[in-house]
Amino acid sequence: MHLTEVIKKPVLTEKSFLGHANGVYTFLVDRRANKVQIKKTFEEIFEVKVESVRTMNYDGKEKRMGRFVGKTNNYKKAIITLKDGETLDILSDL
């Protein structure tokens, strides 16, 4: 898997913003990526040192449109904790 395919986008919620002061960032990642790949990709792209990576798999929700039943996509979320003194400047403008 290529480096640019692992990390999809940041999760921009009120709860995820509370962790930014402590060096904790939340990103949506590819479902096939493991913790080692996520850590390596994050350190190479953003040039920071990662302390830990926690991941969660989510199943898509069932959605209905009249009598038709569909489902949203499954996704994986990674909570990335940076080492002390490290910050991520890409989200500081928000």
Swiss-Prot record:
The record's Gene Ontology biological-process terms are:
translation
Please give the GO cellular component terms listed in this UniProt entry. ribonucleoprotein complex; ribosome
Task: Check the record and name the Gene3D superfamilies matching this protein.
Answer: 3.30.70.330
SUPFAM superfamilies named in the record: Ribosomal proteins S24e, L23 and L15e
Disulfide cysteine pairs (residue numbers): none
How the protein assembles, per its UniProt entry? Part of the 50S ribosomal subunit. Contacts protein L29, and trigger factor when it is bound to the ribosome.
Q: What is this protein called?
A: Large ribosomal subunit protein uL23
Organism the protein comes from: Mesoplasma florum (strain ATCC 33453 / NBRC 100688 / NCTC 11704 / L1)
Instruction: Tell me what gene encodes this.
Output: rplW
